[in-house]
Curated annotation (Swiss-Prot):
Organism (species): Rattus norvegicus
Stated name of the protein: Receptor expression-enhancing protein 4
Pfam (any one): TB2_DP1_HVA22
Similarity field: Belongs to the DP1 family.
One GO MF term: microtubule binding
Phosphothreonine: residues bearing it: T196, T250
Record keywords, A-Z: Cell cycle, Cell division, Endoplasmic reticulum, Membrane, Microtubule, Mitosis, Phosphoprotein, Transmembrane, Transmembrane helix
Spans through the membrane: 1-21, 42-62
Job of this protein: Microtubule-binding protein required to ensure proper cell division and nuclear envelope reassembly by sequestering the endoplasmic reticulum away from chromosomes during mitosis. Probably acts by clearing the endoplasmic reticulum membrane from metaphase chromosomes.
Gene Ontology annotations of biological process type: cell division; endoplasmic reticulum tubular network organization; mitotic nuclear membrane reassembly; nuclear envelope organization
Stretches of the chain forming a coiled coil according to its record: none
Gene: Reep4
Domain of life of the source: Eukaryota
Annotated localization: Endoplasmic reticulum membrane
């Protein structure tokens, strides 16, 4: 464990940070010789990092593995040994020059295939998203229609008729007292339907009703047009006064004769 931590520190400091600063100085000074040297180092170090990924998995159990790795990084970086330039000139450059065309063709094919795969993946994802949205919309519509159908007329009639809440003034509680609802079939004139009257009251409480009289025959048209003429009543006093007056007039005629 200690050797692994020391190895990681050596690779981080001497394998990455110091070469990065030296490359910056070479680019700034525009020294072509130093620029080429550090470019060769970075190529070799990239290959070393790729190989290290697999060797740490399969060969890390080998004794003195981390010590050998630290020594190899220092050998690549040392200006006395110039291990990076040596490996590049003898192994890396000849192998890359031999397989350069094949590597370029593979890179071009990889770019084209990656572009095509990205397009196909994007189309599939859009189709899947559209189908999912359509299915969700249809399911929601079906659920809404089912809920609306479940409400029958009986369910709607069974909803209690709750009146809206009203504000009650504490000073006028008597005027605002709720009135009792009249019984079913009640009419404001004191009249009630016969059917509702039987429903509201029991048999013992119902008042006995008089028998219904048969209706008289309607008058005919001729009878309705006749007018009954009555003789005017003559007072007895007036008739007697008239008789007396007539008698008084006839008396002097008898005396003359």
């Amino acid at each position: 464990m200690v050797s692994w931590m020391i190895c990681r520190l050596v690779v981080l400091i001497f394998g990455m940070l110091y070469p990065a600063y030296a490359s910056y100085k070479a680019v700034k000074s525009k020294n072509i010789r130093e620029y080429v040297r550090w470019m060769m180092y970075w190529i070799v170090f990239a290959i070393f990092m790729a190989a290290e990924t697999f060797t740490d998995i399969f060969i890390s159990w080998f004794p003195f593995y981390y010590e050998i790795k630290m020594a190899f990084v220092l050998w690549l970086l040392s200006p006395y040994t110039k291990g990076a330039s040596l490996l590049y000139r003898k192994f890396v450059h000849p192998s890359l020059s031999r397989h350069e065309k094949e590597i370029d063709a593979c890179i071009v094919q990889a770019k084209e295939r990656s572009y095509e795969t990205m397009l196909s993946f994007g189309k599939r994802s859009l189709n899947m998203a559209a189908s999912a949205a359509v299915q969700a919309a249809t399911k929601s519509q079906g659920a809404l229609a089912g809920r609306l159908r479940s409400f029958s007329m009986q369910d709607l009639r069974s909803i209690p008729d709750t009146s809206a809440p009203t504000y009650q003034d504490p000073l006028y509680l008597e005027d605002q007292a709720p009135r009792r609802r009249p019984p079913i079939g009640y009419r404001p004139g004191g009249l009630q339907d016969s059917d509702t009257e039987d429903e509201c009251w029991s048999d013992n409480e119902i008042a006995p009703q008089p028998p219904v009289r048969p209706r008289e025959k309607p008058l005919s048209r001729s009878q309705s047009l006749r007018v009954v003429k009555r003789k005017p009543l003559v007072r007895e006093g007036t008739s007697r006064s008239l008789k007396v007056r007539t008698r008084k007039k006839t008396i002097p005629s008898d005396l003359d004769s």
